[in-house]
Design a protein with these regions (language model features):
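Polytopic alpha-helical membrane proteins, predominantly small-molecule transporters/carriers
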Residues: 1-224
């Protein structure tokens, strides 16, 4: 299913990237960052799977969402963003909401704290590549950056599936393709938003918005 998800993301990214002429400047940086981002996309998911098996869904989901601390801190410490009082209050409320929404589902002890911390760092670093590109990359290459990211994730995911000898079912294909569209557009809109919205606001809002959307889909589709 994950490979089908990345396949849909790749197709959508190619459709946007193919419509824009590419500047020569910044191509090497875009490709390099895209390769790193794609590898981290898949690595973060595999790490999430491992943590769910060791630490349970609640703690794993919480630390994955708290990964927004990484790009938020990076924006302040490296790129010099300084949130105002209202923005700082909004950030704190967003992080509090993440904790409350996830930890409300139950409490359990971590079997591997190091695994949870690594999940937070990898997930947050993956999201941070969008801010790095926004600061250091060429804006006309943003769709190329996403294309390289998802092509890399797709190829690596296919390699993992082959190594594990996993078969593809009709359900995997259907749900993977359905998940791929919102996955791609959420990444694209995050990248676009960073042009106009400070990262210290964009990332916490993006994370909380994802949680709310998943919750609404759970109510609508599964009557949770």
């Amino acid at each position: 299913m994950l490979a089908c998800n990345y396949l849909m993301c790749t197709v959508l990214a190619a459709s946007f990237a193919g419509a824009v002429p590419l500047p020569r400047e910044g191509v090497a940086f875009t490709v390099g960052l895209g390769l790193v981002s794609g590898a981290m996309y898949l690595g973060g998911f595999l790490l999430l799977q491992w943590n769910i098996a060791r630490n349970g869904v609640v703690l794993s989901a919480t630390f994955m969402k708290l990964g927004v601390l990484v790009p938020t801190a990076m924006a302040m410490l490296i790129f010099g963003e300084r949130p105002g009082a209202v923005q700082m209050a909004g950030m704190l409320l967003a992080f509090l909401a993440i904790l409350l929404i996830n930890l409300e589902r139950g409490s359990q002890k971590a079997a591997s704290r190091a695994g949870l911390v690594l999940l937070l760092l990898v997930g947050g670093s993956t999201d941070a590549t969008a801010k790095i590109f926004e600061e250091l990359g060429q804006a006309p290459l943003k769709d190329t950056f996403l294309l390289i990211t998802f092509v890399t994730a797709l190829l690596l995911c296919m390699a993992v599936c082959i190594a594990r000898r996993q078969s593809l079912t009709g359900a995997d294909l259907l749900f993977g393709l359905l998940i791929g569209a919102p996955n791609y557009f959420s990444s694209r809109f995050l990248l676009l938003s960073l042009n106009d919205v400070p990262a210290v606001i964009a990332y916490p809002t993006y994370s909380v918005g994802t949680i709310v959307l998943i919750a609404l889909l759970g109510v609508w589709l599964f009557h949770e």
